[in-house]
């Protein structure tokens, strides 16, 4: 890489490091809250049960655990507060990179609120479904084998602990996806306020870069048209529709015939594909889990 390229990339690398630290902080906070909810749910549940486990007791166990570790967890005050706090920080910093003047506008605050709400919903929805089969299996085993309360408590703690997200593999994707999208929305808000017409996707360019990000890197998109897509998405209230409105990429975008056999980073996305990606909300990171792409302004 030429010296100029190295020097101009340093601020981006430093910013990426700071972004990663923020994502890890959010992941750590969510892990702690999940563990607390898990332990509290077990303790509260077994305080209500008799020694002998009945069919009714099994139903209570299933309902309480699924609620505590699913919807109730995602909607808890602690989790909602953390999600909102970190999304606000990511959004604000991204906006200030392009427009340092003034504070967050009402439109910015609304975007943060919507992003926070949808992230909290899917946090509870996904994990509730993830642990549901295991809870049902363990409680049925308690009935079949005549396990007592303490024995079932031990089984649940041991088995659920095995699928609980102790590491960053699950929470890293959750926190990264939430904050990368917040940064993208914040960056577009800042560019619009600063009068910037176009932005460019910038991939990392290292050995971990995927074909999707490599192909999109260097592609230019309209700030105004992307702003219109964001506004449309923010008006969606149904969580399923919101998720579908800005889906992750499943394959690299269409490229021009003369560049299709080149390395991903050297390919050129077609004009028609740029229009399609913008319309379908697929022109902003994250393009997939743990996406590390960023946005930079295009100098006219």
Residue ranges of predicted features:
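N-terminal leader/targeting and assembly helices and adjacent pre-domain segments
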Residues: 1-165, 264-285, 296-300
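Acidic, glycine-rich two-metal-ion catalytic cores of nucleic acid-processing enzymes
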Residues: 166-300
